[in-house]
A protein has these predicted regions:
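Acidic, Mg2+-coordinating active-site environments of NTP-dependent enzymes
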Residues: 1-106, 129, 183-195
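Active-site flanking residues adjacent to catalytic metal/cofactor-binding acidic residues
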Residues: 1-2, 108, 138, 167
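Short, conserved glycine- and acidic-residue-centered signature motifs
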Residues: 60, 113, 149
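Active-site beta-alpha connecting loops in nucleotide-dependent enzymes
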Residues: 91, 122-190
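Switch II (G3) loop of P-loop NTPases
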Residues: 106-112
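Binuclear metal-ion centers of metallo-dependent hydrolases, dominated by the metallo-beta-lactamase
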Residues: 198
């Protein structure tokens, strides 16, 4: 269980099973350190071994550490685990990035929940330099959870230099109403950063 996540600690309170923890910050059975976090990937230190992976962000570091811990507990050798982990790549639509000839980086991610969007934008902000802008294009699908729309709008506006709200398959819903629900979550100070396209 992720020891850095308070929800993980809550889950451990009521189990009688043998407990193993992993963390980047807290004391845990399995620890890792992020040495480099770039758009091209992560350089991690796990059990005093360095590992380069083509995955990006803290959330992937936690996922990789969970994989490492599980494989170790199943009896795989450390170097075999690290070698296999180094071959992992992101799936299509998850933090895919392309750099244009003008050195503009575009990132595509299927972040369809507020937490996923927050993780992606925080990861980008942790990697980008101070003079780079983060322009986010985000939409919410129709006939789906309407409660998340204002949350996603607020997160996108807060964590971006500029944000463009657009449609993402409105299905049977009115696209203008979906955009209004997304915009409803934007704070007054962040509203000047937004553009909506129906």
């Amino acid at each position: 269980v992720n020891e850095d996540d308070r929800n993980g600690r809550v889950m451990l309170q009521n189990t009688k099973a043998k407990k193993y923890t992993y963390a980047l910050k807290s004391y845990a059975d399995y620890k890792a350190q992020i040495l480099e976090n770039q758009f091209a990937g992560l350089l991690l230190k796990i059990d005093n071994q360095e590992l380069w992976v083509k995955l990006i962000g803290n959330f992937n570091a936690y996922n990789l550490l969970a994989i490492y811990a599980t494989a170790d507990l199943l009896g795989l050798e450390q170097l075999e685990i690290l070698q296999l982990m180094s071959t992992l790549e992101s799936v299509d639509g998850r933090f895919q990035y392309v750099v244009s000839e003008k050195n503009i980086t575009a990132i595509v991610d299927y972040a369809h929940t507020p937490d996923a969007l927050k993780n992606v934008l925080e990861t980008i902000n942790s990697i980008r330099t101070g003079n780079e802008e983060l322009i986010t294009v985000v939409g919410c699908g129709g006939d789906r959870d309407t409660q998340k729309r204002p949350k996603m709008g607020g997160i996108a506006a807060k964590l971006s230099t500029k944000v463009i709200f657009t449609n993402d398959n409105p299905r049977t819903e009115n696209p203008t109403e979906i955009l209004a629900q997304i915009e409803a979550g934007v704070s007054p100070e962040d509203y000047k950063k937004t553009v909506s396209i129906a």
